[in-house]
Amino acid sequence: MNVDNKILIVGGGISGITTALEAAETGYEVILIEKSPTLGGRISGFHQYFPKMCPPTCGLEINYRRLRSSRKIEVHTLSEVKYISGEPGAYKVLVEKKPSYVNDKCVLCDHCTAVCPSERKNDFNYDMDQTKAIFLPNAMAFPSRYVIDREACETGCEKCSEACKYDAVDLNMKEEEFEFDAASIVFATGWKPYDAKKLKNLGFSSSPDVINNVMMERLASVSGPTKGRILRPSNQEPVESVAFVQCAGSRDEKHLPYCSSICCLGSLKQANYLLEQNPDSRISIFYIDIRTAGKYEDFVASVQSHPNVEMIKGKVAKIDQEQNGKPVVDAEDILNQKMIRREYDLVVLATGMEPNLKEQIPLKEIQLDEDGFMHPDFQKPGIYSAGTAKRPVDVNSTIQDSTGTALKAIQTVRLN
């Protein structure tokens, strides 16, 4: 690679992938760093996403094909930036890469999982099921190979290595560090759902049938823990009644003081999942205000006007668990000026977007706003943010923003 032309992109979700492809296909060298075992980010766990309401395969597979054919993008998964120093056109970067214990000889034959005696919680499905200690991160994993969670392995176990006919398992892999120079840097570090355990009154920790919105996406997905059937986590029975609790943590000075932008549309979309599976489902959506940015008026109107969808303006005070195990919601109904208490099969908390940048920044000069987002106006030249690292936005807006960010990164390279 030409040192002078390198662009570092931190984060391998849809934002980072888009930025990398746009820069590389313009002729610039890119290093793409992702801390998880696979690219794809949050979108890879969705059942469907706007604007076309298609599964992530329809967007990610095209981008993965472009990545495979590009000679200008160097991808490092299980990697984190530990240190950055320098100035625009001449940044020095230190990256730490963790071992996957499986090399690129892996052909996904699955012989290893057949003999593996250990299991681990499946973080891709938000711990709603389990995988073996050697596992494929998800059905669309890129790179497409297994990974070993050594912490889940039995001491001294080498059964997966013995079962592999392709010498793909390497239990002697070590953590490594490498350094390189980069002309410009883009943080496309994405978001995480706000920790619903902090919302003590909403029953997330006390009832298995109180879940958050990203867990709902996995329940609806054919690659999820229930193969696409929306069932109660507690007993795997079909869901007949659901409550969606909007602004679970968002627009709350004690938690996330801002609107997370996507939650209202997300809940209406998920209500539609339920109606498609069971048109007789009874759905209540508890909201403060319905905020649906973008050109989705017809979709919003169609869901809200469904006879089995009840829009209830009011805050949820608390969620308890009845003796029969079902969650019960106590809430205010502002328009009808009364308090209500109702039992549901399932409660979905529309938890807000929290920026991943809050966790760790390897460059002191980076400025975050009070909510943890990387405001573009306050950054050192040559350092940029893209997508939800900048502000809460949906997938479509993230892609548009990332395309523009690629151009900014390219301009830094050309000016230096």
Where are these regions (language model features)?
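Residues forming the flavin
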Residues: 1-416
